[in-house]
């Protein structure tokens, strides 16, 4: 509830400036879990006053079609965030397609430019959602991290690796074992 209240205030400030936040979600294929997840994102956008565009491409879409979709979204000035839902069909280069997303619109924080900032200890780019959420939960719970040892299970590009970087960043200063 607290996060949602903060978001509502931030969105209201944007709307006062005549800017409605706008998220595009691209889903390729028919993975049931992905469709449920995207549906919840679209409903959350509606609830919060964020405009959302939901783009569905068939499982047999070509990588070129997805590339064209991303490049088109990058060019839209009134669009503030792009999310390409994982997993993509096996015939697609997920990392290559992620690399095409404008880093300033990369809401997942997976673009190499955003991950590179994180490696440098900079928090001025888009940060991966789940690791950022973990850091907020630690803060809300009053758990001090400085000088502590943290264990991160897994090295995934989506959670494990960015989580270890956030925990070892300046100001957090944990010793991390992966």
Model-derived features: where do they sit?
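Glycine-rich phosphate/diphosphate-binding loop of Rossmann-like nucleotide-binding domains
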Residues: 28-42, 122-178
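Short beta-strand elements in bilobed, periplasmic/extracellular small-molecule ligand-binding domains
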Residues: 23, 45-59, 173-178
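N-terminal glycine-rich anion-binding loops that anchor highly charged ligand groups
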Residues: 13-23, 30-47
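Short, well-structured alpha-helical segments in soluble
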Residues: 65-77
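Acidic/glycine-enriched edge-of-secondary-structure segments
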Residues: 1-5, 51-60, 124-127
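Positively charged, low-complexity intrinsically disordered leader regions
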Residues: 1-19
């Amino acid at each position: 509830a607290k996060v949602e209240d903060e978001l509502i205030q931030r969105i209201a400030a944007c709307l006062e400036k005549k800017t409605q936040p706008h998220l595009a979600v691209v889903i390729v294929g028919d993975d049931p879990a992905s469709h449920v997840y995207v549906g919840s994102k679209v409903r959350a956008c509606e609830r919060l006053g964020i405009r959302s565009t939901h783009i569905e491409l068939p499982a047999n879409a070509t990588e070129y079609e997805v590339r064209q979709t991303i490049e088109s979204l990058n060019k839209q000035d009134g669009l503030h965030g792009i999310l390409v839902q994982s997993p993509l069909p096996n015939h697609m280069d997920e990392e290559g397609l992620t690399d095409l997303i404008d880093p300033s619109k990369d809401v997942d924080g997976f673009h190499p430019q955003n991950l590179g900032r994180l490696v440098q200890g900079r928090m001025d780019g888009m940060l991966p959602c789940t690791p950022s959420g973990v850091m907020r939960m630690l803060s809300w719970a009053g758990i001090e991290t400085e000088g502590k040892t943290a264990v991160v299970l897994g090295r995934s590009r989506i959670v494990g690796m960015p989580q270890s970087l956030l925990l070892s960043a300046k100001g957090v200063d944990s010793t991390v074992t992966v």
